[in-house]
């Protein structure tokens, strides 16, 4: 599918054993698309493919209902293994993500500022950092610009940032934008 809307439509209209879903879709965040697919077909396994850092997006994808998360740079090595594992009823995480999760368990429970954000606040952060206006973000998330403004205010407060320039700098420095 070339878009979130098309992916959701195809899943609703057809029967699939498994869905491979790109986290970066042109019309909507892949995590939001995943949530919609899981609302429609909760038992359908979905493996997320992404070019984004696993430690940033892998956990969010798994929490949203993904059965697996594969980074595109290693997809040729891991995809067959991931599909087999998910089709056998288990979840799949890459060795790199497993290592990151194990390391974080041993570290202090202090989270990085962006890890405190809700999914919508996180989406807002990424889109603001990418240069989108409040109106463009509202259209992308199918919400009002006023709601986007509330998300922006919350993320600024939670992350102790002052403006969109600081948001963009933070997102770039932490690998949260393309």
Predicted regions and their residues:
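Short hydrophobic/Thr-rich beta-strand motif most characteristic of the beta2 strand and flanking loop
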Residues: 1-3, 10, 161
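Recognition helix of helix-turn-helix DNA-binding domains
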Residues: 133-166
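Helix-turn-helix DNA-binding segment
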Residues: 111-146
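Active-site residues of response regulator receiver
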Residues: 22, 50
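Short, flexible helix-to-coil linker/hinge segments that flank and couple to helix-turn-helix
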Residues: 56-63, 67-119, 123, 176-177
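Conserved phosphotransfer cores of two-component systems
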Residues: 12-16, 36-44, 64, 174
